[in-house]
């Protein structure tokens, strides 16, 4: 019996261990489906992930069990995928319909260049190629001044795209206001710009652009330190027992590429005093301690060593800064927050006169139409004085922030040779700006229908220069001096207009004011997109003087693109029958039309020129004004009859 038991035990130990059969319940039966094949979802099948092949055993190779587990029901259909499987299948398994939205605010950018090897312009659209062919600029002229061609084409493109319409809003970029001009709580647009730094009358000659910021070096930047430096952490107090660190000071921390946080300008920078009895370890040699240090003492010594290393770095950088000038730190240009329509309206309400302007002015008569509103003549109720009113829809103004600055500057620019600002109102959605009305019209009609003498030309130049000198002293560049913007009274008084508010109240449509961006009065530095200052107004005055001589400015009969080319390349324009002019007049024009702005005269210089001594009285211009009005009325009648 014992032998039989031993044999059974040896057989049992030699046989491989097998899983005991699954217990069958009374309601279970063999699975009629046979072998169970694991189904894969469509998403995993589509992925064809090799990990699935290696991680999961092959179902076909596994031994099948004909018995079902007790939790399986008989004859049940395959269960549907759960919610998670359906979600994965919808994301990965099924193809997604790609929906591409339409572009928003598309901008077509044209990059024009010139290839010196081929002698051809690159990046020219077909429209520009046709324009260049029809401009009248020969191939030889293009090859002689390729860079000038690129500059003027970019200039013309910018004006043709509509960007030139906003130029009028930048006349006051440099304006200087007296202290306390702004109402409380207002933060109007800055009166200065990077192109025109803040200036005074003596320094506002030819501003230069700021030099480009230095390029960052490949190595880690060294922060520029001031004379007072705040360490990252205050050095701890020395321990009671004088101890020397058992190891040399650690290496200085590597300066990270992240720039340190800027400190507010008004925050005082102070350095905490260092106790006199605290030793400073700089390059201290290692010394074996005489006693075992506690963890607290060791931590304190490590902090002291770190503070000493930082102090050593600071001392070296201070010595270096004293011997070498510190490199300029490039600061990002601050961006002025764009005011909302609500903010602009709130600021305008603070500076505009309250009340209903329709009760103060009556008999409004429309005499002109601008891009954002109309120009009317009206009469003041109390004085019966005729005024000009510009009604502007604020929603159509491209530069709402600058309107506030211009109103404040115009209030401070009272001058006898400037069409003065009288009042402003907010009426509904419109801004009403009330200005002086010059019933004589513009100088354009005078030069078109009359021949002026040198004395009369000198009188116009003197009055214009007087107004320009006042504007320049305020930091204002007019940038659009021409006969259209010189208005006269019936008595011959002369005043400058068009400062953003005053539209062309002359309703005549001619080549001067209908063509977009025709720069016949512009200085060469404007056409070639260079930095410029107040001397651009002096050049325009010289061109206007030629206009009074010949009846039109130079190059008026040329195409706009060729006019740009001639202004940029010819320099001082030639005057027809220049020999018929007096020497003093020729010298006056020569000083005003210098190509180099540095050598061009200022308004102050030209007011002292001998040409001013031959000025005729202003009332001598009254007959010319009346004659021009009659001729203009007859011309309108003829056009109307035809």
Swiss-Prot record:
Q: Which organism is it from?
A: Talaromyces marneffei
- Protein name according to UniProt: Serine/threonine-protein kinase pakA
**What PROSITE patterns does the record point to?**
CRIB, PROTEIN_KINASE_ATP, PROTEIN_KINASE_DOM, PROTEIN_KINASE_ST
Q: Write out the residues that bind ATP.
A: 367-375, 390
Q: Which gene encodes it?
A: pakA
This entry's Enzyme Commission designation comes to 2.7.11.1
Subcellular location(s): the record lists:
Cytoplasm; Nucleus
For this protein, the record's CDD domains field holds: CRIB_PAK_like (cd01093), STKc_PAK (cd06614)
Task: State a GO cellular component annotated for this protein.
Answer: nucleus
* Domain annotation CRIB: ranges: 100-113
Give the source's domain of life in one word.
Answer: Eukaryota
What are the positions of the active site? 480 (proton acceptor)
């Amino acid at each position: 019996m014992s032998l039989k038991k031993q044999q059974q035990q040896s057989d049992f130990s030699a046989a491989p261990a097998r899983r005991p059969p699954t217990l069958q319940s009374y309601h279970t039966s063999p699975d009629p489906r046979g072998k169970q094949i694991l189904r894969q979802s469509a998403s995993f099948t589509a992925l064809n992930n090799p990990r699935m092949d290696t991680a999961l055993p092959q179902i076909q190779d596994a031994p099948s069990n004909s018995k079902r587990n007790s939790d399986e029901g008989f004859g049940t259909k395959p269960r549907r995928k759960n919610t998670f499987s359906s979600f994965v299948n919808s994301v990965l398994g099924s193809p997604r319909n790609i929906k591409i939205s339409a572009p928003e605010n598309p901008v077509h950018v044209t990059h024009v260049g010139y290839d010196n090897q081929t002698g051809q312009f690159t990046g020219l659209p077909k429209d520009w190629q046709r324009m260049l062919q029809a401009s009248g600029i020969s191939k030889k002229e293009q090859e002689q001044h390729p860079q000038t061609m690129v500059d003027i084409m970019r200039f013309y493109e910018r004006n043709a795209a509509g960007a030139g319409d906003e130029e009028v809003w930048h006349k006051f970029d440099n304006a200087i206001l007296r202290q306390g001009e702004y109402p409380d709580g207002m933060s109007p647009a800055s009166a200065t710009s990077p192109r025109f730094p803040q200036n005074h009358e003596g320094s506002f000659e030819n501003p230069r652009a700021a030099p480009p910021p230095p390029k960052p070096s490949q190595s880690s930047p060294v922060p520029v330190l001031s004379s007072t430096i705040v360490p990252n952490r205050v050095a701890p107090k020395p321990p009671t027992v004088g101890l020397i660190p058992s190891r040399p000071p650690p290496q200085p921390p590597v300066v990270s590429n992240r720039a340190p946080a800027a400190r507010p300008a008004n925050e005082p920078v102070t350095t905490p005093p260092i106790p006199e009895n605290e030793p400073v370890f700089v390059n201290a040699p290692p010394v074996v301690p005489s006693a075992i240090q506690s963890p607290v003492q060791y931590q304190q010594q490590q902090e002291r060593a770190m503070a000493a290393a930082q102090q050593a770095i600071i001392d070296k950088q201070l010595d270096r800064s004293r011997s070498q000038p510190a490199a300029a730190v490039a600061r990002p240009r601050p961006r002025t927050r764009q005011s909302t329509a609500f903010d602009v309206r709130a600021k305008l309400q603070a500076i505009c006169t309250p009340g209903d302007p329709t009760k103060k002015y009556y008999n409004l008569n429309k005499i002109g139409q601008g891009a954002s509103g109309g120009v009317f003549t009206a009469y003041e109720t109390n004085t019966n004085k005729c005024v000009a009113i510009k009604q502007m829809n604020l929603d159509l103004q491209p530069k709402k922030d600058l309107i506030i600055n211009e109103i404040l500057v115009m209030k401070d620019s009272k001058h006898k040779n400037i069409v003065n600002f009288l009042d402003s109102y907010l009426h509904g959605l419109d801004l009403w700006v009330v200005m002086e009305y010059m019933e004589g019209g513009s100088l354009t009609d005078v030069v078109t229908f009359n021949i002026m003498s040198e004395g009369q030309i000198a009188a116009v130049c003197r009055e214009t220069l007087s107004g320009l000198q006042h504007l320049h002293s305020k930091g204002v560049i007019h940038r659009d001096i021409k006969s259209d913007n010189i208005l006269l009274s019936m008595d011959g008084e002369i005043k400058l207009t068009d400062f953003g508010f005053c539209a062309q109240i002359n309703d005549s449509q001619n080549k001067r004011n209908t063509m977009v961006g025709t720069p016949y009065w512009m200085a060469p530095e404007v056409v070639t997109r260079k930095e410029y200052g107040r001397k651009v107004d002096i050049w325009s005055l010289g061109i206007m003087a030629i206009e009074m001589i010949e009846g039109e400015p130079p190059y008026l009969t040329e195409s706009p693109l060729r006019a740009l080319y001639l202004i940029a390349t010819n320099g001082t324009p030639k005057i027809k029958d220049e020999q018929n002019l007096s020497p003093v007049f020729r010298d006056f024009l020569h000083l005003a039309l210098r190509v180099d702005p540095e050598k061009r005269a200022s308004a102050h210089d030209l007011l002292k020129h001998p040409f001013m001594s031959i000025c005729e009285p202003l009332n001598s211009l009254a007959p010319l004004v009346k004659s021009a009005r009659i001729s203009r009325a007859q011309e309108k009648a003829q056009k109307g009859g035809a």
